């Protein structure tokens, strides 16, 4: 074999090795970050993990491991004292659990509690359960968790208080506002929306998602919580 042929062959081998190292070795391309939702857990698996009434569970897997989001609701009434009316309270609670493998116990990572109190008026509060979800909108392998809720303390036709929370890892975005009230024969009222300033710098996919959730809930909850 000539000297030039040896040089060409050696150069080709070097390029092949460099390509294999770039692609993660002989096994091909490096594994991509994955996200997927999982089937619901049994009541026995969830025993002792939440207070009150369980409304929804979201089970998923992402680059941080197995995740379990539990949504619950509890009610209590403080008795009337002297000249004060009884005080009703509904507490909305979301809690994220993680575990390293199937044999490990679930460990709480964060809790978000929203106690709503109402004295002498009608109290209503709950989640928009079809807007409670885990997603991977920006395809980075880390789940975004969406919570959307409503509350009302009043005695007439008034707007509900609306809240959207979007959490991804340590980052949290929030939108608050009022439901749009439409009564036949009258001008609509309510419908105000206030965005967390940090939302403006979020990824476009996340901002679009929040807008979509707001459109879905902006008229409030028509029935029981």
Q: Over which residues does each language-model region extend?
A:
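Short consensus segments that form the blades of beta-propeller domains
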Residues: 78-89, 120-125, 152-158
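Hydrophobic helical h-region of N-terminal Sec-dependent signal peptides
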Residues: 13-21
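C-terminal motif of bacterial Sec signal peptides marking the signal peptidase cleavage site
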Residues: 23-25
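Acidic, small-residue rich beta-repeat scaffolds with periodic aromatic anchors
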Residues: 27-63, 160-163, 167-225
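N-terminal secretory signal peptides that target proteins for export/translocation
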Residues: 1-10
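Surface-exposed loop and turn segments in beta-propeller and other repeat-based domains
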Residues: 108-124, 184-192
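Repeat-based blade/solenoid architectures
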Residues: 49-55, 116-131
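Acidic/hydrophobic-patterned starts of short beta strands in beta-sheet-rich repeat architectures
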Residues: 64-73, 138-149
């Amino acid at each position: 074999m000539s000297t030039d042929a040896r040089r060409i062959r050696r150069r080709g081998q070097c390029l092949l090795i460099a390509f294999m190292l770039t692609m993660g070795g002989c096994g091909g391309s490096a594994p991509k970050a994955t996200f997927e939702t999982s089937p619901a857990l049994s009541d026995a698996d969830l025993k002792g993990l939440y207070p009150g009434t369980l409304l929804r569970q979201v089970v998923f897997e992402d680059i941080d491991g197995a995740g379990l989001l539990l949504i619950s609701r509890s009610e209590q009434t403080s008795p009337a004292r002297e000249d004060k009316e009884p005080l009703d309270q509904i507490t909305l609670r979301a809690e994220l659990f993680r575990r390293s493998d199937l044999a490990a116990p679930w460990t709480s990572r964060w809790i978000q509690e929203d106690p709503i109190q109402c004295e002498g008026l009608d109290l209503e509060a709950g989640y928009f359960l079809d807007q409670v979800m885990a997603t991977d909108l920006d395809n980075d392998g880390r789940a975004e968790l969406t919570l959307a809720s409503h509350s009302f303390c009043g005695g007439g036709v008034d707007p509900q208080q609306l809240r959207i929370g979007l959490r991804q890892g340590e980052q949290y975005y929030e939108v608050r506002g009022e439901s749009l009230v439409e009564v036949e024969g009258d001008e609509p009222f309510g419908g105000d929306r206030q965005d967390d300033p940090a939302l403006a710098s979020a990824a476009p996919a996340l901002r679009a998602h929040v807008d979509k959730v707001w459109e879905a809930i902006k008229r409030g909850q028509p029935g029981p919580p």
